[in-house]
Structures are given as C-alpha cells and as structure tokens.
C-alpha cells in the first residue's frame, strides 16, 4: 500500500446518488470550486427487482473524477483528500479478489417484501428496532440478505463481503473492505454503540452470514491512501488520503445544516421525496411505537440524526400541474409542466387557506413515513362547488406541510428552526407553508451539493484542517444559511387544527386504501 500524501488545497467530495454520481471540488473553507457529474444507471426487472452494475458504478466514479480533473488544471497535485458517500441501503456483494457477485440490489429493489412481512411479525423485531432505531423495510441490506438467503443462497455463499454503494467505491479507491458507523448501526447494529449487535443479526436470521459484514471505520478519524490502480483510473495521485463518508442522508444533513447554530433545529430536503431530520444526543432519541423511520449516526461523538421520510413530496406538485398542462395543451400549442411551475405561488395566493384537505400519498409505492402502508394513496377531502384549481394547488402544497409535521411529530417535538434544501425551497408559498405547519422559522441552505460537502467535511477534519467537526460546521455550513423567515401566526394556528383532521383522516382511510388495493 502506498504511503499517504500530505499537501494540496482542494478536497474532493464524491456523492454517488441514485440519479447522478457527482465529484465536487471544495477549498478548505468550504467554497465549491467545480463539479463533474455522470448520470447513474440501474435496471428495473420483474417482481420488483432494481439492480445496478458494480463495475459500471466504479467506471462512472472514475470518469467523474477524470472529468473534474479536465475542468481543474493541476487537480491531482492540488488534491489534499478525497471523501466518498453514496445512496444508502441496498446490497453490493463482492467475492474472491474483490470481484462483484452479480449486480447490486439497490434501495429501490422491492423483492424482499415477503421477507420483511415475515420478519416484522417476528418476536424479535421490536428488539431489533430498539437497537437500530430503524424500521424494517425492503430497502435495507439486512432484509435483502435475509431474502437472498431464502431464495438464492448461492449469492451469499459466493460472497466474501456485503457492502453498500459508497463502500464499494471506497474498496476500488483504496483496496480496503469497510463500511461506516451509520449504515452499520442502522442496518445490523446499535446506534448507541455504533457497532454490530448480536440481537439485530439474530432477528434478521443472519447469524451464519455474519462473516460477510465488513470492518467499521470512521472516515473523520481514519483514512487510507489512494491505490496505484485507482490513481491510474482517476488521474489523481497515488497516496492521496481517502475518507469513507457516512451514508448520503447523513452527509446531506450535515452539509445542509442539521447541526450548528440554533439548538433543536430540523432539516428537511424537499425533493421528489421528503426527508426530515433532527440531530439529537443519543439519550434524547424518541422511538415511536409504530417502529418507523431511521436513526443515523453523525460524525460527531454522541450525536445522531433521527429521520422520517415521506415517499412523495414535490411529485405531488408535479402531478397537479401536469393535470393542468394536459388540459391546457393543444396540438398547436403544447403546455409543459415547466411552463406552469412559475405560476405555482400565484395560484396558491389566489386561494383560501385550509379549504381542502389533501393527503400527499401520490407515489404508487404508498407511504413509508411516519407510517408504512404500500396501499396508501393521495386524495382530496372537503371539496365544494366553489373550489377551483387554485384551491386544489394550495391544498397540495398544504398537504406537504401536513406530511412534514406528521414526520416531525413521530420524532418528538417540533423543531425550533427548520432548515430546508431542495429546488422547491425557492417557492415562497412552500416555505411559508412549511414554517406555519411546524410553527417554526425557516432558513434555506444555499449549499448546492450538500451530500458531497458533508463527505468533504469529514475529510477536512480527518486531515487536520479543522480540530473538530463543530469548527468545520461553523465555516462550511452556518454562513450558507439564509435569513430566518418567521411563521405567520394566524396560519400556524389554523394549521394546528388542520393537522388534527389530517391525521384523523389518515388513520380512518387505511382500511379504504387496503380495500381499493385488493380490488385491483
């Protein structure tokens, strides 16, 4: 193994997402200098299969780094460290000589549904949840490996290590098989110890497969040098320190502002899905009786982020605007979704608040947070003849606010301040709705690539650019948080009452959704 280099003024953060793999260059103060991206590819198959080529993923990573080097002359010599994060969950198996054992089952793969149902009903599932803080679902490596062990045990028989996406890239960058404390503890371990837990492994029925679980390393404390083979593939210099980041949700939360500044702040990413996070001391974690959500370690001693995710966020807005676009279009003058997005706030402001109740379960996968029901579906309640399209638009936006509140309620109290990221944060209507829904001021993070930044922050601490993560947060995160926007008191009061109806209706509709699903 080559020796570690100790020079340079750039840190590269790699974020291998489900849609795009990005390599982003930052200076030591957290300023984004340049980025390069490669579109990610995965294959959808029968029975809920969604797979991704391990070899292609590494090739895409190497290409992104080479493309970044083409944009930044002298990048190899200037790079002080590299850090990698990526899409969470999923199962990336490697065998002899670190060769892939088939394609990865990524987090979108739903083949383990029957195994999840069986394990969730088992006598040890609550103990598993109490240790991991994480609800069991088809996304997770534990459920997927348990399913493989039932239907295709030869996959596990031929494997020597079960990795996640970022772990696979780290193996290719450094030659080291490892995983990080976040994915290790929410999948197979205990968020209090950040180590594997025998009870969890037994609850999943994977005692005989424990040998596949790799070493746990913390990339903010230890690094490995870039291998000669990886250097040749990426155009970087052998020996450059490489940090294994935490899972992408944790890195995005860190980069976007889940920690720092106002105590008790929450961080919500409003994209196709909604991801809602609270950083808390381990002792303050509230585990709900439904057994949903995630508890994910952060690269700060004793601090974790509690997470609830709702399946459908901006896809609800896309849906209602696409309905309008379809109605407005003619062969001579087509109207697109993009044409209508600028009108969202105007329609919202032309309507009455709280006139209609909307549940934003528009995803065909149903809902996963703060409750799990694959049959959950969207719907309007309270329509009258006086309602027009602006009322529908407003109710959809308000439904996202209610879903956000529902997720934070499952984690305990409302946040003292809400930091929001994602393209939808540009909408004043959405910002005001989220603020009133949780009755807290909102601030928008200007950080463009929060996941890559979070990973790079770990490398910055590891190489000694900052004495501790709190010091890095003060320079990389807090200056990028926008002005505080206070909630409208009248709307906050109205939404307090609306949420009661929202939740009561959500609970009452569950058997209706199930009956609709059984009739299809």
UniProtKB/Swiss-Prot annotation:
PROSITE patterns to which the protein is assigned, alphabetical: FGGY_KINASES_2
- Keyword Membrane present in the record's keywords: the answer is no
Q: What induces it?
A: Induced by erythritol and repressed by EryD.
What are its GO biological-process terms?
carbohydrate metabolic process; phosphorylation
Note the CDD domains from the entry. ASKHA_NBD_FGGY_BaEryA-like
Query: Which reaction does this enzyme catalyse, per its entry?
Result: erythritol + ATP = D-erythritol 1-phosphate + ADP + H(+)
Q: Does the keyword Kinase apply?
A: yes
Q: Which keywords does this Swiss-Prot/TrEMBL entry list?
A: ATP-binding, Kinase, Nucleotide-binding, Transferase
The EC number on file is 2.7.1.215
Q: Which domain of life is it from?
A: Bacteria
Q: Which ranges of the sequence are coiled-coil?
A: none
Top enzyme category: transferase
Q: What does this protein do?
A: Catalyzes the phosphorylation of erythritol to D-erythritol-1-phosphate.
Instruction: Report the family membership.
Output: Belongs to the FGGY kinase family.
Name recorded for this polypeptide? Erythritol kinase
Source species of the chain: Brucella abortus (strain 2308)
Classification from the root reads:
Bacteria, Pseudomonadati, Pseudomonadota, Alphaproteobacteria, Hyphomicrobiales
């Amino acid at each position: 193994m080559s020796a570690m280099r100790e020079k340079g003024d750039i840190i590269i953060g790699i974020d291998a997402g489900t849609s795009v793999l990005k390599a982003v260059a930052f200076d030591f103060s957290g300023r984004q200098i340049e980025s390069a991206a490669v579109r990610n590819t995965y294959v959808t198959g029968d029975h809920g299969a969604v797979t991704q080529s391990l070899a292609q993923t590494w090739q895409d990573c190497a290409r992104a780094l080479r493309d970044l080097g083409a944009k930044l002359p002298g990048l190899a010599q200037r790079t002080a460290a590299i850090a990698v994060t990526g899409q969470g969950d999923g199962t990336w198996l490697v065998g002899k000589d670190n060769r892939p054992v088939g394609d990865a089952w990524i987090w979108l793969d739903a083949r383990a549904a029957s195994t999840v149902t069986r394990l969730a009903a088992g006598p040890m599932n609550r103990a598993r949840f109490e240790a991991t803080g994480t609800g069991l679902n088809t996304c997770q490596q534990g459920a997927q490996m348990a399913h493989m062990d039932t239907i295709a045990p030869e996959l596990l028989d031929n494997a020597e290590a079960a990795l996640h996406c970022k772990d696979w890239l780290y193996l290719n960058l450094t030659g080291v098989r490892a995983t990080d404390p976040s994915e290790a503890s929410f999948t197979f371990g205990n968020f209090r110890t950040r180590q594997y837990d025998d009870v969890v492994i037994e609850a999943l029925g994977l005692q005989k497969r424990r040998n596949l679980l790799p070493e746990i390393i913390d990339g903010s404390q230890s690094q490995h040098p870039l291998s000669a083979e990886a250097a040749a593939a990426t155009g970087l210099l052998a020996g450059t320190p490489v940090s294994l980041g935490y899972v992408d949700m944790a890195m995005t939360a860190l980069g976007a502002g889940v920690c720092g500044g106002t105590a008790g702040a929450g961080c919500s990413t409003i994209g196709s899905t909604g991801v809602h996070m609270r950083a808390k001391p381990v002792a303050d974690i509230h585990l709900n009786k439904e057994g949903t959500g995630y508890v994910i370690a952060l690269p700060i001693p004793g601090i974790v982020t509690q997470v609830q995710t709702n399946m459908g966020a901006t896809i609800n807005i896309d849906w209602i605007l696409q309905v309008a676009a379809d109605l407005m279009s003619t062969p001579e003058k087509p109207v697109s979704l993009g044409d209508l997005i600028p009108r969202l706030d105007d329609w919202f402001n032309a309507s009455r608040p709280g006139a209609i109740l909307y549940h934003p379960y528009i995803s065909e996968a149903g809902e996963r947070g703060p409750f799990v029901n694959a049959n959950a579906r969207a719907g309007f309640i309270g329509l009258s003849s006086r309602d027009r399209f602006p009322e529908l638009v407003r109710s959809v936006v308000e439904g996202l606010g209610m879903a956000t509140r529902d997720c934070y309620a499952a984690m305990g109290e409302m946040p003292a301040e809400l930091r929001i990221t994602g393209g939808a944060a540009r909408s004043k209507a959405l910002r005001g709705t989220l603020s009133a829904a949780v009755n807290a001021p909102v601030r928008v993070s200007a950080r463009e690539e929060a996941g890559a930044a979070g990973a790079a922050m770990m490398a910055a601490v590891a190489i000694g650019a900052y004495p501790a993560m709190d010091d890095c947060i003060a320079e990389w995160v807090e200056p990028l948080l926008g002005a505080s926007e206070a909630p409208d008191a009248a709307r906050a009061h109205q939404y307090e009452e609306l949420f009661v109806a929202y939740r009561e209706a959500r609970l009452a509709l569950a058997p209706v959704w199930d009956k609709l699903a059984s009739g299809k």
